[in-house]
Amino acid sequence: MKVTYIYHSGFLVETDSCYYLFDYEKGNLPCMDVSKSIIVLSSHGHHDHYNPAIFSLLKSCGMQTVYAILSDDIEVPELTTVLQISPGNEYQLWMNQSLTTFESTDVGVAFLIEDQGELIYHAGDLNDWVWEEESDSYNEQMTKNYRKQIDLISKKLNGRKIDVAFVVLDPRQESNYDRGMCYFLEHVSAKEVYPMHCWGDSHIVDVFLNEHTEYTSKIKKE
């Protein structure tokens, strides 16, 4: 499995069966095998997680087979093969992969894909969005909602390890920036974890690793 960081929450994952392009906003794509299928996944319609121009970009790159998996808050583009998804469901994909969706604490879904025995997780905007300016009741409910979804992921895994996970680490949350990441790492087993949604502040990953040295071996920098 090969992982390429694109921009913000956008990643390209190559497996033996296909490419997965998660939450593309903008950025350059690497050279790809045009005979291989690519699945474009967008967790929700926020501008930093979905850009409809991706489909014309892939066409200009010569990609021959393009599929799309879009959250149900996104207007479906004029494509021949689109799967529109909602939270809390399971789907069988075109090349015998399976997809489980989890409910975001903001909008849309998080993705858990199984592809020939390998597991890929992309959080979208599923995070413990605690803010200092919000009320205690808001933040308490947010944490409750987030932990419920992470616990559902752990239950779904039933002791298995995620091979590659993409998890929010947002510096705008200030002292609460690591709440979501820490709970995920404590309750979900993953081999490699890529922080995302950092708004260009890659230094926040160094801050996290300095404060949580126990995760040095599994946290991957862009």
Residue ranges and their predicted role:
Residues 21-22, 41, 120-123, 166, ...:
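Structural motif
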Residues 27-29, 46-50, 73-77, 90-92, ...:
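Active-site environment of divalent metal-dependent phosphoester hydrolases
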Residues 149-157, 174-183:
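A short, acidic, amphipathic alpha-helical segment used as a generic capping/interface helix at domain edges
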Residues 26-73, 155-166:
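Active-site metal-binding motif and surrounding structural segment of the metallo-beta-lactamase
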Residues 1-35, 81-161:
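Core dinuclear metal-dependent hydrolase active-site scaffold
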Residues 33-34, 52-55, 80, 134-135, ...:
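Short amphipathic alpha-helical segments
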Residues 1-8, 77-91, 177-222:
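Binuclear metal-ion centers of metallo-dependent hydrolases, dominated by the metallo-beta-lactamase
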Residues 38-40, 56-60, 138-141, 182-185, ...:
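Glycine-rich, phosphate-binding/catalytic loops in enzymes
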